[in-house]
Amino acid sequence: SGDPVTIVVLGGDGSVDEVICGLQNLSRVTLGYIPIGSGNDFGRGLALPSDTMKALDLVLHSEQTRKINLGVLHYHDKVHRFAVSSGIGYDAAICHQLCISRVKVFFNRLGLGKLAYAACSLYRLRRCQPDEMEILLDDTKSLHFKRVFFASAFNLPYEGGGCKFCPDAKP
């Protein structure tokens, strides 16, 4: 239906990403966020409360909303929306490593989730190889690079559990 809907995400950046990618009609969605992930760069980038109860209070009682722009990546015949960042190469390999290894679970149980990013970064750094890449900007300008380790687009300043990769990013 065309009725407005509110969705509250309890999770981290991956949960926000999954919800955003799964939505069909973003113009009628209000998104609430309660940060319980390991990185929480979405909330950090929007200056939302990191405390779970304060975030819940904001979701339940705030009458203010704000619109944010989402990044959109077109890859062959696929479209991927993102709220925080999107990348290929080294940074994507780190995210993939976090998803398939037990390192993130281990560090999260110790309350040291940010160290998981550092551990996976070091692990992937030794295995990183450059590749050729072509970027097509707005379907008009093509840029070719011979040795690329990674390429990232940022919608928010932070990635990787609080690393300020793109300080001037504004959603």
Predicted features and spans:
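Conserved residues at the C-terminal ends of beta-strands
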Residues: L10, H74, F154
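Conserved residues at beta->alpha junctions
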Residues: L10-G11, S85
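Glycine-rich nucleotide phosphate-binding loop and flanking beta-alpha elements
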Residues: G14-V16, N40, P157-E159
